[in-house]
Amino acid sequence: MVIESLILTLEIALIATFINIPISFLCAVIATRSNNETAKFLIDIIVSLPLVLPPVVLGYFLLITFSPSGLIGGILDALGFEIVFTKFAAVLACALVSFPLMSRAFIISIQSVNKDLEKIARSLGSSNINTFFTITIRESKFGISGGILLGFARALGEFGATIIFAGNIEGVSRTIPLAIFQSIQTGDDQNLTLLILCSVILGILSVFINNILIQRSKKNKWV
């Protein structure tokens, strides 16, 4: 049970993280480089809402959206696709809950890049796109890496949205947090101890690596 839950947790968190990377990057680019204030405002709402709403509410929104009676779920059901109470449902729940942390880390990291470096590059003939990838991304790479890790760590600990949208199904959606919940309910103290230990170790590793990336990001700044 412990090994199965650990592997499932890592698998779901990794997939959710990879889904979030391009979306978070796009949001960060719009938030930091767009001249359209309306677009920036909408991005701020999109990034902030999942952060302030309870995970169970997010799970409920996913449930009514992707259930066969929902708009998107109805279309998918007609095409023969089932989302609710599947592994992909757990992935979507983890992705939605961890998305704001990754996005905000990307935004802060890109905003912290020295604008003078970008101006110098453009004055030397570099295009905006080339400047963005050779200067902006290069200077913010450790912050972006930290954001990815932060999103991954949040996905590892996701519980509320997952249990509402994906259920607590062994081998399908029973990640470590849900397995801990199950062990508490059944009084399985042996597995409970091992699961909590795994969760703590993963959390410590994530924080440790994230702190290293933050320190490297500070040292990497050009003066």
Feature locations, PLM:
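Transmembrane-helix boundary motif in ABC transporter permease subunits
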Residues: 15-47, 62, 75, 109, ...
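C-terminal transmembrane helix and the adjacent membrane-cytosol boundary/short C-terminal tail
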Residues: 39, 107-123, 189, 193-223
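Membrane-interfacial helix termini and adjacent extracytoplasmic/periplasmic loops
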Residues: 59-95, 166-169
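Periplasmic/extracellular loop-to-transmembrane helix junction in inner-membrane transport proteins
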Residues: 1-17, 34-36, 40, 183-189
